[in-house]
């Protein structure tokens, strides 16, 4: 019962490929008792078999066979661990450029971020270059609503715990995070070794010059966001499982409202069903409040629900598909001009859908929203505008002012983040309700 009492926080761990995200996260989970010695010994054996001895902690999270062989995190791995005062769900997001889509899904579910940066000469520079993913990840996290972060400067053991190098990295990173919009007081910088465990739970003797908090102390200083319990239910679906003996189990994070056992829920397709049971981290629940990642059993065929769909209360403002929507976008990284007819991929909550720029309504000042030009011919890097977007597949989105997590998005093309935006108005499709299929 103790877990119920604790504040719960969702953390996303982000950073460039090979910065040591999975190792740091795995080691932290081990130190906090989230995995036993026997399991770790098995993982160590497996790592040795694959000639990757230094990956034993990473394997705590890298559970897909393909990931263990390549040593890269592909899906967003979810794990739970506890400190004496808090309960955390940790989302280890992929750092590899090809897997940025999965990273966005992970980030959209988090309350706070831990950005892991490798201190090693060349590695920091690689991650922070135009081709590296560190800057992209930090921007995506901010756009997805994460306003508090820890920057863990990792692999300090490889640079002899050099204070000067630490300060040089802090200066570079804090300057960049400030430009994105992060407030200085909401970001902490901590020197660590994810493999050796320096500064994770207790102050390290190898870092006598560092007087700040350890990684776990800094985690416990994160503010727990106010949970929007009173709003209608919204659960963006991350995965759908078909489990023998149970049936269809969609999994997602409750963003607003309360999901209850026995409630009649409706998905964006119009399909409805009663919630037969729900659980989080193998604990059965009667209800789940915002911030909780849950799996719940519904009497629907697995093919009727997909990742990216949204679940709501059938009797209270159920989620609907958007015909089109009006949004403010800021163009960040497009090699040319964005014009009407452009069709990139839109990433919003857990959905990734090709979306067309139907009309460019205006060009505006990014900070103030002041009108610069009506019906512009194009938008280019650094410019902001109001546009009408049309999704090419069924998609549930909401106004940012009503449901923040379902109202902010990232636009991707050519494996890069082209633009970010927030939704101001949604034009809905007229839908008919479909009853749960008979079992």
Swiss-Prot record:
One of its GO terms (cellular component) is cytoplasm. Gene3D superfamilies: P-loop containing nucleotide triphosphate hydrolases (3.40.50.300), Translation factors (2.40.30.10). Residues 6-229 form the tr-type G domain. Residues 71-75 are annotated as: G2. Residues 154-157 are annotated as: G4. This is Elongation factor 1-alpha 2. The lineage of its organism: Eukaryota, Sar, Alveolata, Ciliophora, Intramacronucleata. Residues 193-195 are annotated as: G5. The keyword Protein biosynthesis applies. Pfam families: GTP-eEF1A_C, GTP_EFTU, GTP_EFTU_D2. This protein promotes the GTP-dependent binding of aminoacyl-tRNA to the A-site of ribosomes during protein biosynthesis. Its main location: cytoplasm. The keyword Membrane does not apply. Residues 15-22 are annotated as: G1. Residues 92-95 are annotated as: G3. Keywords: Cytoplasm, Elongation factor, GTP-binding, Nucleotide-binding, Protein biosynthesis. One of its GO terms (molecular function) is GTPase activity.
């Amino acid at each position: 019962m103790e877990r119920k009492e604790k504040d719960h926080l969702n953390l996303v761990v982000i950073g460039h490929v090979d910065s040591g995200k999975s190792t740091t996260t795995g080691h932290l989970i081990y130190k906090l008792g989230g995995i036993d010695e026997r399991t770790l010994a098995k993982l160590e054996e497996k790592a040795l078999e694959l000639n990757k001895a230094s990956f034993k902690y990473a394997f705590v999270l890298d559970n897909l066979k393909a990931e263990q062989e390549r040593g890269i995190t592909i899906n967003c791995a979810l794990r739970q661990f506890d400190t004496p005062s808090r309960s955390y769900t940790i989302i280890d997001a992929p750092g590899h450029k090809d897997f940025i889509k999965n990273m966005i899904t992970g980030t959209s579910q988090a309350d706070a971020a831990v950005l892991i940066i490798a201190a090693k000469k060349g590695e920091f520079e690689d991650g922070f270059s135009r081709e590296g993913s560190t800057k992209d990840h930090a921007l995506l996290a901010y756009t997805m609503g994460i306003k508090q972060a820890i920057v863990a400067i990792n692999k300090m053991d490889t640079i002899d715990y050099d204070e000067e190098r630490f300060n040089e990295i802090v200066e570079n990173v804090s300057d960049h995070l400030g430009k994105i919009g992060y407030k200085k007081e909401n970001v902490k910088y901590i020197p660590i070794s994810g493999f050796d465990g320096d500064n994770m739970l207790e102050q390290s003797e190898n870092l006598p010059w560092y007087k700040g908090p350890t990684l776990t102390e800094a985690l416990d200083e994160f503010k727990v966001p106010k949970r929007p319990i009173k709003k209608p239910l919204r659960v963006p679906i991350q995965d759908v499982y078909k489990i023998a003996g149970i049936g269809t189990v969609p999994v997602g994070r409750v963003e607003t409202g309360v999901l209850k056992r026995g409630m009649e829920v409706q998905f964006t397709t119009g399909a409805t069903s009663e919630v037969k049971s729900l659980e989080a981290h193998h604990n059965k629940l009667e209800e789940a409040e915002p911030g909780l990642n849950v799996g719940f059993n519904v009497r629907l065929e697995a093919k009727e629900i997909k990742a990216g769909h949204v679940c709501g209360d059938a009797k209270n403002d159920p989620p609907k598909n958007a015909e089109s929507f009006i949004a403010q976008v800021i163009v960040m990284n497009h090699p040319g001009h964005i014009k009407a007819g452009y069709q990139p991929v839109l990433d919003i909550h857990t959905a990734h859908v090709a979306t067309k720029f139907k009309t460019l309504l205006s060009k505006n000042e990014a900070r103030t929203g002041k009108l610069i030009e009506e019906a512009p011919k194009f938008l280019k890097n650094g410019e902001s505008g109001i546009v009408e977007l049309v999704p090419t597949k069924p998609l549930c989105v909401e106004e940012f002012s009503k449901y923040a997590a379902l109202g902010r998005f990232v636009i991707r093309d050519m494996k890069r983040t082209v633009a970010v935006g927030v939704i101001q108005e949604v034009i809905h499709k007229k839908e008919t309700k479909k009853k749960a299929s008979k079992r």
